[in-house]
Amino acid sequence: MTLSFSTNTDRRAPPLVLVTHEFFPHRGGIAIYAAEMARAAQGLGYEVEVWAPALPPGVAEKGWPFKVRRLPLAGDHGLLSQWRMARQLEAQRDQLNAATLYIPEPGPLLAMLLLQYFDRLQPARLLLTFHGSEIQRLASRRLLRWSTTHLLRKAVRISVVSAYARDLFIKHFPESAPKIVLTHGALRTDLAPSPPDPAPRAGATTVILTVARINPRKGQLQVIEALKALPAAQRASLEYWVVGSHSKENYDTALAAAAARADFPVKFLGDVPDEKLDDIYRQAVIFAMTSMPHNPSVEGFGLVYLEAGAHGLPVVAHDIGGVPEAVTHGETGLLVAPGDTAGLTAAFSQLIADPALRRRLGAAGRLRASQRTWRDSAQSLFGQPDTAPPF
């Protein structure tokens, strides 16, 4: 969607302040989304400043093309972090009231739900992005739904990361439908993948790779169980590699137990830095992230599927949430219904046995990953900064 603008060239857009709880060195799709939208907005010509949680001790700041202000808070979704974020926003209300305030994720959104009732923080423009799971959480309780509806009325533009998230949002907050734009994610700017060899030499290890935080919603357990049901000949050369930080739940224990029962190696590689991920992708043959419904959480899109595609890997995933917008069944990967363990095993078996299919899906994945840009998404949400949009 392209925004229309006034022809009065004296009305430049106000500075853009992006406030997020998830930013470097935090890992994950939302942290990437926040950083790349800031980078793209700066590239469009906006004066961008990102407000993010304090760096951990010993971690140096990256060289960003925009300003970064570190706030004295941890950046989780706990009540203390929400209170501290609210205090920071209130303390800087004069700056924010003269700026475009962009909230790209649910952390600071919760603080905004509280501050809106004081009517002291009134940014020149308020822009919001929703990813999926938070939509269900905000709609699940009457007070939260009411507060969110009130805040949405103040937003001039609302973006969602997938058509699935758009439909979910309109289902729960139909009044805001006219404000919605679609802002798909794209590849990280610093990603320069080396394509893997999709047809490993005879006798070589067949590596199945998952890159995701270790969490029930990411489906690592479902992958292990599906791989255990493969024919013995395919399991003989199989390894399953899991990249991702450990969960705070008891999921680690369940995964370790499942891995111990497998007759093939399951390697937990931990939280691998971005600069070392390329080598891991290059050794893999198939990428798998079989997202599962977990409480109110759902996969709204999945940037990591694009990253796997950029490395030329065919994808095995569940047909859930916004995943089909990142992975096209039969074109860039194979999709299976959640809970269909036999179907998941069959998908893995088909790809392991068919190098030509892997090459075809991998090539299509590389093409798909290159077609989306952060600039397009930033343009849809922010518009050009040379004139102020007549919202």
PLM-predicted stretches and their roles:
Residues 128, 150-193:
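Donor nucleotide-sugar binding/catalytic pocket of nucleotide-sugar-dependent glycosyltransferases
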Residues 244, 252-276:
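Nucleotide-activated donor-binding/catalytic signature segment of Leloir-type glycosyltransferases, i.e.
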